[in-house]
Amino acid sequence: MKTKVLFLSAILASVTLNSVAHSAVFNLATEKQNIELNQSPKKIAVYDLSILDTLNALNIQAQIVPKATFTGSLTKYNQAQFIKAGSLFEPDLAQLKQLKPDLIFVGGRSAKTLESLQPIAATVDLSAKTDHYMSDLKNRTLTLAKAFKRENMAAKKLKDLDQLQLKVKEQTANKSAVMLFAVGDNYMPHAANDRFGFIHELTGFKSVLPLTEKTDTARPEAGSAEALAAEKKNVELLKSAVQQNPDYVIVLDRGAVNTQKYASKQGIKTHAVLGQSQAVKQNRVIFVNADAWYITGAGLDNTAFMLKEIA
């Protein structure tokens, strides 16, 4: 009888230990990857600011980040206590080997480095898909929340974001806009399916441009016949947008990244095409924060910030 009791006790102890061990396992599953660790990661490296922004929003702190200018809710990462290893495009492999992170995140600009990082530590690609902006943001947020046990916090943040978006869409109902990406004196209109065209899904502004026909053609070399043809097409597209008389012109000024110096605020007024638009003449122009829209992008807190710029 005593032997049987001891045997049962041993089984129960084994089950308990296995349960504890299993509950300690960290699991992060995406469509393409399934990351499993024996414990929750203590040293995290992040090479995409939209991911860093979402982690930060969920009170999950990275220890290793790229050399970059951190703004907004990410300003603290400028501090020396956070190790800088590589850039947003190229993580420093040698430095990471010495630092031995438990988990590495890549996405967007750094996504191509996934395979080179995997021998160093578990690495996951959480690149944003802005062609379905909000659903993708929610999926990536919930993926992180589940892995790091932040479900309640994520649910509240996402609910607040939904309410904010609804408020913005109430204000933009039946209003149109053209999204412009400005590089110097060159203003490039972005249709709803272009890189920054997600603003239409995000804010509810109707686009005045037709959807762009997508190609795999590389950007033409400056000064080439192809580049001149593309420039001419761009001017025609601008003229077409102005003729549609958009209620608002929205400008993302590349030159203001890391400087917050918006030369386009003056340049747009004297632009041969845009200067003739009613939106510009009547000061219905929104210059969005260049760091937020161009560098940080589709993060949880940053998306709320971007919506508030339009509200």
Feature locations, PLM:
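Bacterial Sec-exported substrate-binding components of ABC uptake systems
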Residues: 3-5, 11-12, 16-50, 152-184, ...
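Short helix-initiation/N-cap motifs at beta->coil->alpha
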Residues: 30-32, 85-93, 214-217, 223-237
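A short, structured surface patch at a secondary-structure boundary
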Residues: 43-98, 109
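Extracytoplasmic substrate-binding proteins
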Residues: 116-187, 284, 289-311
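A short, acidic, amphipathic alpha-helical segment used as a generic capping/interface helix at domain edges
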Residues: 232-242, 270-272
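Alpha-helical, coiled-coil/dimerization segments enriched in small aliphatic residues
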Residues: 69-73, 192-231
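Proline-aspartate-enriched helix->loop->beta-strand connector
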Residues: 97-106, 122, 241, 245-251
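Structured C-terminal subdomain patch of bacterial secreted/periplasmic proteins
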Residues: 135-136, 244, 248-311
